[in-house]
Amino acid sequence: MRAVVLTTYGGPEQLEVSDLPGPAAPDPDGVLIRTAAAAVNPVDLQTRAGLHSAHGAFHPPMVLGWDVAGTVTAVGDRVSGFGVGDRVVSMSAQMATGRGTYAEIVALPADIVAPAPASVPLTAAAGLPLAGLTAWQALDALALPEGATLLVTGAVGSVGGLTVQLARLRGLTVVAHVRSVEDVEQARALGAARVIVGEDASTLPSGAVDGLLETAGLPRAVAAVRDGGRVVSVVPTRVPEAERGVEVSVSYVEQDGEGLAALGALVDRGELEVRSAKELGFEEAGEAHRLLEAGGVRGKLLLLP
C-alpha cells in the first residue's frame, strides 16, 4: 500500500510516499479501513520534528496521522457493529500506538471507530475526530454549569472552532478570542456571544469569565478568569500558572468511538460544522505541513491517497 512515511526526524521535506506492506487482515476485534482522507494536525508536525521522541523509540519508516475517514474493507471475527462498505471515521493515537493514518489502508480496533456523518463528504469528515474529541473531552473536564461564561482562545482554529460550537450547545455563553479582525465574523457565526481581537492576552477583560479553554497557548490568558474559576488547556507545552484560586488542568485527548459517534450525530443534525481548508494528495504531505506551520489555516488540511 502507499503511505506517507518518515525515515528521520526533521522538516517537511522528510516526508515521502513509499510502498509498504499493508495489513492482510484485521485483528479479531478490529477493522480495516480504506482511507478516503487523513487530516493534518499540529501533533503530526511536532512528531515529524522529533518533539515527541521521548514518548517512544523511533522505528522507521514511521507513518504519521491521527485522523482518518474511509470505508470498511474487512471486519474481525468478533466485530458486530460494522460491516464491509460502511463509511467510518476514527482517531488513532499514533504517538502511542504507531498506527498512523497517512496510509491507503489503516487497521484499527473497532471500539475507536464510528459511523461517518452522512451529511458531509467523506473526505471532509476526516477533520472531525481529533479536533472534535479534543474539544468534547476538554469541555467535559472543565465541567462548567449551564449559563456560565467561557472564554475560548484560538476560537477559529480547528479545536477552538469546534469548542465554540459545542460550548454553545451545552448552554454556555462563549467569549471568543481571535488574533485578527478578519476572524470576527466567523467566530460569531460559530456561536460566540462576544469576540475579542488581539495578538496576546492584553485585550482580555480581567476576571470576567467563569472558565477558560486554552487552545492557543496564550500567555496570561488566565487573568481573564474570575477568582476560583477553572482553566483547561489542550496545549501541554504552554499551561497557564494557577493564581487566585483558579483551578488549572491539562486535557489530553483519548480515543473514544462512542464520543466520536455522538459528534457525528451532531454534524448530521446540523448543530456542528466541520470546516475543511484544502485537499492535497499524499505526494503533497510536505506542503500540507508547511501550510499548517505557517499559520492562518482555517479548517482542516486533508491528505488524499
Where are these regions (language model features)?
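Mid-domain Rossmann-like dinucleotide-binding core that forms the NAD(H)/NADP(H) cofactor-binding site
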Residues: 126-200
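A short acidic, Gly/Pro-enriched loop at the edge of an enzyme's catalytic core
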Residues: 204-210
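Glycine-rich beta-strand-centered segment in the early N-terminal region that forms part
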Residues: 21-40, 52-94
